[in-house]
Amino acid sequence: YNKYHVKEIDIFDPLFTINKKRVIEICKEIQKRNINIAWSCRSRVDTIDEEMLVEMKKAGCYRIYFGIESGDEIILKKIKKFTKISQIKKAIHLTKKHKILAFGYFMFGNPGETKSTIENTINLSLSLPLDYAQYNRVSTLPGTVLYENLKNTLGEDYWKKYVKDKKFERALPRFDCNLSDEILNKYIKKAYMKFYFRPIQVFRIIKSINSIKEFVRYVKAGISMIIN
């Protein structure tokens, strides 16, 4: 901080807020040392509470990225997220109460996913006071239960083969999900359009703009979203 004059850091640890005592100690130490720094972090919705948010705000936290994943209780159980819709709503509302930006990550194509469960996810994202939302197709990565299930289905370790030789690259089938990439992409576009082109969201974005350069960037992003 003193040597390189760092003004902002982003904590990528997805489990940063899992140990409340540790988080509060870090926040108090930042305040004790008078470190004037802005920072953001990742969090689950069920590991954050008001006491923690108060200290995080005092210590310079200005944005939290939440892995919400789905807005359907059945899907959340299937992917073993072990969170509830009520916890999602509480975490986001508490974060906004303390004037911290809330960013939500959502995934389409989970095991058991249907058009109906995707609609539930989109509707939840629209009902939350999120500043930003990101929607993606599920990626099956090594080390996850989903990948182990897929590996058993395929009868091979795709990632091991791919790492050794890129010629083995191919689209992986989805485990327990019959929705095609084309359908998922349509829902992703629908979600982005519905989320970012609402009057309230446009107002939030305009309110957050601090420069002409930033304004131009948002305009380009909006045009790109419409075209693509």
Enumerate the predicted regions with their spans.
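Active-site groove signature of glycoside hydrolases
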Residues: Y1-F12
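Hydrophobic alpha-helical membrane-insertion signals
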Residues: Q201, K213-K220
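A structural motif corresponding to the C-terminal lobe/cap of the Radical SAM core domain
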Residues: L15-K20, E25-N210
